[in-house]
């Protein structure tokens, strides 16, 4: 088949024309024959099943009813008119309704003939109705029926109201297959097809739109899901291979004095098995000739900072400098304080550069950075300024990288003749399947165990009616010298309301915890950055016992004495947010607590979130539940939505297929990195089509 044929504009398909083409483009994004072919059904209806009118349920999904049209009438309404048909079977009566196209419908309907009506039903004033049904004479319906399974395609209200019903879309699909004539080019290798017993491409495409039976349909769906996920994984793995072959890195071959001295004599605690494994992975990367491009995932408190420091010591022992970039000044200061303390026994020079660094100190930093006297620089995006020049930057560590734009991150690459090694750290657990799909081009390390002896944070759910008991608990904790966070939600759509909630809460807390015995900080989004910083620092220094805040409490803020986190209206937070907020406590030796406050009125999803939070403290387990509740697009945000814009596979439901697809993509490239073997010619050709059309599904044929 000529692949260009499928790029034919959709208006040239028989039965479409310019008006329908405009609607298909606007409503479903169908511009070409290819796009229509890739409009996969949402589900399938068993066309051998018919309902009696008396057995219909309110607001049912698509159903089929056999009956006769006995009467037609036009009814006036506020805007225009509607056409109503009385539709009867042996046991009951319902209405068929059209809001447009009355003249054509009236002329073509035959009273007292037997029809099959197909569509969604509504129930109003004691009567069932079906708006804009698909209607077909029973005798025609029976003669046409090739398969018991009728595909139900994605649609919109505008399409249905304009007469582009499911039957019309099915008809267009039939017409397209008539014009295609020839079979589809195979996209997978014979070996993969044989080993996994996958259905051939031509048969899979035919069965997805015109299923022979349930068994063949299941095979077709599996085949196409595997194909989609296989080529996504292949793309990501090739990107990684190309990166490693083209972008050379400085080989750090020496494990020298600083690393050995710190590791053997000055480690403040024994490393966990996970930390040791991750350090080994990083050492292997740094020792190769390729630039490291690694994502380090670790739950709150898992010990990423010590791994970051050991990585920087390897760079320093090899005569290079290192930097660590954090998204906020407070986090930068905390990293600086922690790393300075750890580096005291070593002869290492370390500085911090942020937006508030004085000009005179800035000049000193710039100078010592350029002449190589400064070993480690920590800071905010101030590190990206053109004036910041390193003598030989060998390792750049980015904390919470999702807070930085791509352009900002790429600036670090150009701080040296060759790009430095890159280590990206995140405390936001990403489910394994999602990480494979979104960050599949990075090497991924996971610290999946917490240091021994760390006490689990006790998490409880309390209703608003128990508030006085919660206040009593807070008083008991502050009397013991502990500090407390009280956090309110901030949802942009109701920012004014949320601000009022926060201020009302602050007022009632101030009454309950009066001065001078209690000192309270308040932080919210409407404050100036300097004021916010001032209040946060008062709490960090222990000058206030209670911090009342919206969700602006930064990831990574470390106040070891804070042992209680109260989250107000917890049902309004996502699981990831709840877990991150809980991670603000439990940093010290004392037992910590997280109290989730809610009203009694809770949705099913909210109950699941609260049960998950009280049931586990494992960030990866929580992330898996979050993925199931929210879906991948919402979880990762719009920035990654392109990677996750899947046509037929579902990352949440098809994890087993994703793992198999990645395994086969990896095996294929290990044996044939350039895809030059004859057995991989189909894969190579398909991969070339992906590059040409920049779309996973534009290679389908």
Feature roles, as predicted:
Residues 75-266, 671:
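Upstream accessory/linker segments immediately N-terminal to the RecA-like ATPase cores of bacterial MutS
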Residues 537-547, 552-560, 565-568, 583, ...:
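Accessory helical-bundle/CTD segments and flexible terminal tails appended to RecA-like ATPase motors
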Residues 22-23, 249-296:
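Conserved pre-motif I regulatory segment
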Residues 1-14, 26, 232:
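Long, highly charged, low-complexity intrinsically disordered interaction regions
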Residues 277-280, 291-611, 671, 701:
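Inter-lobe coupling/hinge segments of SF2-like helicase ATPases
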């Amino acid at each position: 088949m000529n692949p260009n044929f499928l790029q034919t504009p959709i208006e040239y398909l028989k039965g479409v024309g310019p008006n329908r083409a405009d609607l298909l483009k606007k409503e479903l994004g169908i511009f070409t024959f290819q796009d229509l072919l890739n409009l996969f059904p949402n589900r399938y209806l068993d066309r051998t099943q018919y309902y009696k009118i008396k057995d219909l349920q309110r607001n049912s999904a698509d159903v089929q009813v056999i009956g006769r049209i006995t009467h037609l009438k036009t009814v006036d309404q506020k805007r225009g008119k509607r056409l109503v048909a009385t539709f009867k079977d042996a046991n009951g009566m319902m209405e068929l309704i059209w809001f447009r196209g009355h003249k054509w419908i009236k002329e073509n309907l035959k009273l007292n003939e037997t029809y099959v009506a197909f569509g969604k039903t509504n129930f109003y004033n004691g009567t069932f109705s079906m708006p804009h049904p698909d209607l077909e004479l029973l005798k025609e319906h029976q003669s046409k029926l090739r398969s018991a399974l009728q595909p139900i395609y994605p649609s919109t209200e505008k399409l249905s109201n304009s007469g582009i019903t499911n039957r019309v879309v099915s008809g267009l699909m039939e017409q397209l297959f008539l014009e295609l004539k020839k079979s589809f080019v195979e996209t997978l290798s014979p070996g993969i097809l044989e080993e996994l017993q996958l259905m051939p491409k031509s048969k899979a495409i035919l069965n997805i739109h015109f299923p022979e039976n349930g068994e063949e349909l299941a095979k077709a769906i599996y085949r196409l899901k595997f194909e989609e996920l296989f080529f996504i994984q292949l793309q990501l793995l090739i990107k990684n291979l190309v990166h490693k072959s083209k972008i050379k890195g400085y080989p750090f071959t020496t494990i020298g004095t600083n690393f050995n001295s710190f590791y053997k004599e000055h480690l403040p605690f024994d490393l966990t098995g996970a930390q040791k494994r991750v350090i080994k992975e990083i050492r292997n990367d740094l020792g190769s000739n390729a630039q490291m491009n690694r994502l380090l995932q670790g739950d709150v408190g898992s010990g990423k900072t010590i791994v970051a420091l050991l990585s920087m010591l390897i760079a320093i022992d090899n005569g290079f400098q290192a930097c660590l970039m954090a998204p906020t000044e407070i986090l930068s200061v905390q990293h600086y304080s922690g790393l300075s303390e750890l580096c005291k026994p070593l002869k290492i020079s370390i500085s911090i550069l942020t937006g508030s660094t004085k000009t005179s100190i800035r000049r000193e930093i710039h100078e010592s950075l350029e002449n190589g006297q400064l070993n480690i620089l920590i800071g905010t995006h101030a590190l990206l300024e053109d004036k910041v020049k390193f003598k030989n930057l060998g390792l750049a560590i980015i904390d919470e990288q999702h807070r930085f734009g791509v352009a900002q991150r790429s600036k670090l690459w150009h701080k040296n003749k060759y790009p430095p090694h890159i280590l990206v750290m995140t405390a936001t657990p990403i489910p394994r399947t999602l990480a494979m799909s979104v960050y599949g081009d990075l090497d991924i390390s996971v610290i999946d165990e917490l240091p021994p002896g760390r006490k689990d944070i006790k998490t409880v759910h309390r209703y608003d009616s128990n508030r006085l008991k919660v206040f009593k608990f807070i008083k008991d904790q502050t009397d013991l010298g502990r500090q407390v966070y009280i956090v309110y939600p901030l949802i942009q759509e109701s920012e004014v309301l949320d601000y009022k909630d926060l201020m009302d809460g602050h007022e009632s807390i101030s009454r309950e915890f009066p001065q001078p015995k209690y000192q309270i900080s308040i932080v919210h989004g409407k404050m100036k950055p300097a004021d916010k910083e001032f209040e946060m620092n008062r709490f960090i220094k222990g000058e206030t016992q209670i911090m009342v805040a919206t969700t602006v409490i930064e990831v990574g803020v470390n106040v070891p004495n804070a042992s209680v986190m109260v989250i107000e209206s917890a049902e309004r937070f996502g699981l990831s947010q709840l877990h991150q907020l809980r991670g603000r406590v439990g940093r010290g030796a004392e037992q910590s607590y997280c109290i989730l406050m809610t009203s009694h009125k809770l949705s099913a999803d909210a109950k699941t979130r609260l049960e998950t939070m009280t049931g586990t403290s494992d960030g990866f387990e929580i992330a898996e539940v979050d993925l199931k509740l929210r879906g991948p697009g919402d979880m990762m945000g719009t920035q990654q939505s392109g990677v996750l814009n899947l046509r037929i596979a579902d990352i949440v439901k098809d994890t087993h297929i994703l793992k198999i697809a990645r395994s086969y993509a990896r095996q294929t490239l290990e044996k044939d990195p350039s895809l030059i073997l004859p057995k991989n010619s189909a894969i190579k050709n398909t991969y070339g089509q992906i590059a040409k059309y920049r779309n996973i599904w534009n290679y389908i044929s």
